Amino acid sequence: MKTLNRIAQVLLWLAMLGLSVWVGGTLYQMLVVVPMWSAAPPESVRAFFLGTKYNETIWNFFGPPFMVARLALLLGALLVGWHLPRHRKWLLVAAVCMAFGVVFTLAYVYPINDVLFAQAGGNHSPEEIQAMVRQWVMADRARFGVGVIGFLALLRALSIPIPMNGRS
């Protein structure tokens, strides 16, 4: 059990590091980047996404490989730490929240990204683009809220000592 507990502890720390970076990056995105393109759609959408390399660089931080890595570390901590009853419920909450975030992003947010980010609004009317911007911002805030709940649950799990003397 001692080795399993050490592995669980390492995975908890790595998962926390990954989610901490995500929380900070998402806050920056919400407070600094999103207002640049959502301020006055459709003009701001077209100016930002046609005039910057945002679509080329955003994948360096928020892309699917990083979603998978964050979730994999968390699921690894849950699986390896399943025998730790005091940690299990917090890890479950964190895993469910983050899994929801990934599924919601892929199923709901990315289709909007395709129109707003990749096509800079495309041939959609100004009203449609404005509506998509509002939907995206609300979805992003909801996704972040659920993610923060998961982050706090993981922080709680990390704050509970893991026994290293062989007991769970």
Language-model-detected regions and their locations in the chain:
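Short, charged juxtamembrane terminal tails flanking transmembrane helices
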Residues: 2, 160-168
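Interfacial segments of alpha-helical transmembrane regions
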Residues: 3-20, 75-100
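Interfacial loop at the N-terminal end of multi-pass membrane proteins
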Residues: 7-11, 15-72, 117-133
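Structural signal for membrane-spanning alpha-helices in multi-pass inner-membrane proteins
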Residues: 26, 77-81, 105, 154-161
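Core segments of transmembrane alpha-helices
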Residues: 66-78, 146-151
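Hydrophobic alpha-helical transmembrane segments of integral membrane proteins
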Residues: 92-117
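C-terminal or internal capping secondary-structure element at the end of a domain, subdomain, or sheet
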Residues: 134-162
